[in-house]
Structure formats: C-alpha cells, structure tokens
C-alpha cells in the first residue's frame, strides 16, 4: 500500500494517547504517502481542544500538534474539490458529509482511508476503508 488517506480519528492519536495510538504511530515510522483533506486540520484542532478541556493535554501541546500536522501529511487536498463526490456518498450512505470527504478522497486517489471511526467503518464501501486496529504496512 503506497498511498493512505488519514482521517481525524487517526491523526488525533499521534498527539493524544488513546486506544490504538501505537498503531497510529506505526503509520509514521515507515510511512506510505499520507493524504488528507484540508478539513483534517479543523477536525484535529477541534479534537485537540476537547482533550485540552479534559485536561489531557496543554495549550502548548495543542500548538505543537497543529504546527506539526503540516509536516506529517504529505499531500493536502482542497475540501471544496471533493464536495460533490462527498455529497453523493453522503446521500448514498446516509452519513455525514464531513466523514464522506475522506471517503471521496480515497476514491479519487484509488487509495484506502485509515480510520478509527467505528460508524464510518460500518457504512463505508468495502475496500475503501481499513480499521486502524487492522492496518498493517
């Protein structure tokens, strides 16, 4: 597997210790090319903020994480260019457009989206997503 789409449920695990954080870090050790929609920056920032509110991380750690994500993701994709395909997936799957942006990007790149989002895993077309817990290089 040479290209992966990473969603926010995986990216947050690079910065906050959660279940399967070790697996998420393995993606970074011998990384394939990592892709993400620009939307990931916002979702990651929101997830980091929630963890700050729970006193699990500091404001400094939030700043470090938001600064480092640009170096971690190899290819950023404009969310707007994925919107039409994401909307179609959203209607077909009866699922939030936010998540379908990641699926649309995976489809466009003929790649796989790695996620820890159980609901997304349950509704996504086969072969388009892989559970973080099941990901292997």
Show which residues each predicted segment covers:
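Short, well-structured N-terminal submotif of metal-dependent ribonuclease cores
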Residues: 1-40, 51-64, 119, 136-137
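Active-site neighborhoods of divalent-metal-dependent phosphate/nucleic-acid chemistry enzymes
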Residues: 71-116
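Phosphate- and divalent-cation-binding pockets in alpha/beta enzyme and binding domains
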Residues: 23, 43, 85, 122-123
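Short glycine/serine- and small hydrophobic-enriched flexible loop segments
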Residues: 46-53, 107-108
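Structured helix-beta-strand junction loops
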Residues: 30-31, 72, 109, 126
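A general alpha-helix detector
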Residues: 43-48, 68, 85-86
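Short, conserved alpha-helical segments within structured domains
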Residues: 40-41, 61, 65, 82-85, ...
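Acidic, PIN/NYN-like endoribonuclease modules and their adjacent C-terminal/linker elements
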Residues: 1-3, 95, 103-137
């Amino acid at each position: 597997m040479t290209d992966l789409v990473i969603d926010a449920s995986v990216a947050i695990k690079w910065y906050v210790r959660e279940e399967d954080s070790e697996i998420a870090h393995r993606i970074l050790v011998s990384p394939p090319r990592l892709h993400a929609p620009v939307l990931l920056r916002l979702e990651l920032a929101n997830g980091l903020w929630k963890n700050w509110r729970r006193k699990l991380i500091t404001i400094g750690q939030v700043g470090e994480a938001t600064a480092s994500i640009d170096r971690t993701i190899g290819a950023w994709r404009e969310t707007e260019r994925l919107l039409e395909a994401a909307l179609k997936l959203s209607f077909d799957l009866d699922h939030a457009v936010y998540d379908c942006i990641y699926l649309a990007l995976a489809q466009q790149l003929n790649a796989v989206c790695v996620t820890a989002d159980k609901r997304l895993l349950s509704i996504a077309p086969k072969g388009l997503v892989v559970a973080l817990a099941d990901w292997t290089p």
